[in-house]
Amino acid sequence: ATNAKVLKPYHLPYNPLALTQPRVFKPLLPIHVANTFNDTLSRVYHLGPKQSSTLLNCIKSAYVSRGIIPNDPKTWTLPAPTFQNVYSLYMGDDDIKKGDSQEAALRTLADFEVFEADSRNTESLFDLLTGVVVIDISGYDTDLQNLIIAITLDLFYAQMQARGSSKLLGKHRQLTKMILVDEADNFLHEGFPSLKKILKEGREFGVGTILSTQFLKHFGSGDDDFSKYILTWVVHNVAD
């Protein structure tokens, strides 16, 4: 009835390393994007400081291999590297110790071919989300599910900021996108920053968020109390 477009986490047609230029110039944009991707993957798979630093260097090298220089904005419009480029650099560097949790994490993303490997076959996530779009991650490992959601929200937040504020008509603001995270309890306790930022700032950009879960206590998971960012509640039947 909704004519939804259903995407499986296989060759997802958006690039988490894409460079989206914000309206307010941000120096060293490739470094910011690299740091966000690195932080998210490190958080999901609990990578140590040394592992995280190694991954960050691989991401930065991937940008340079595509001719993208962090301090040269004129190069930022070149096609960005994909995760597959990063993985190839990582596996091809004999100085990097393999056989640890970092390699396992990267190999999982590579083996499942979650993201499209050719940047020419990718598009803006914000443009992709036209009509009803479902990313069906059921049946995948929990860590991989969390990683896909977190990376997608990271990219969505960056592109939301770049698009700028939505239109105002009197006191009413245009609604441009609505995000629904089903079974959100699996994700909330991880404390990913992009979700909180979208909840706090999304109104200005016409972006709404629906978090669906079975217990009220899930909204207070971890160090964050997500309930304070929610203005509308729909309660059907909860055990707590």
Each predicted region: which residue ranges?
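P-loop NTPase motor domains
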Residues: 1-207, 220
